[in-house]
Amino acid sequence: MAALLACCDPLTRTGRPDLAILTLLARLGLRAGEVAALRLDDIDWRRGEITVRGKGNRHDRLPLPADVGQRIVAYLHDGRPQAAQGRTVFVRAQAPYRPLTSNAVTTVVACAGRRAGLGLIGAHRLRHSAATAMLRSGGSLSEIGQTLRHARPLTTAIYAKVDVGALRQLARPWPGELA
């Protein structure tokens, strides 16, 4: 994930929105369509919360991590075109300043993946990465499911793939030959 974020230059017109988009996807596990639908009114800066308009016309509030908020602020102050109309957070960098679509968000991820040398990756892979990071930091499947806004626990279980590398560190080495 670090390589993906590092390939975005926060000092450029395209780097700031890309960095904000990738951070939202990677840290909160948002879907591409949820990032595209994000509106300025969905961010409650005082409470440190973000309202996500998800599948099934759901509206869920999530905590807004400091790093995510900082990247959004950097984009809003120095990246979002002044002439942009409407309340959508992410808009095209060049006129006409229309809201980004979910396909445009997916393209941001794909381009960043290529620049980072990761090959072709999609926005949904960052959702899986977010779930894995939550699991590694001690989050329960229930907590992860709530953050990812899964309707069924079984869906969350799919995201909790076995981390073979971590298991190797926990497992004892094979003692030797069979008797």
Where are these regions (language model features)?
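Conserved catalytic core of the tyrosine transesterase superfamily
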Residues: 1-179
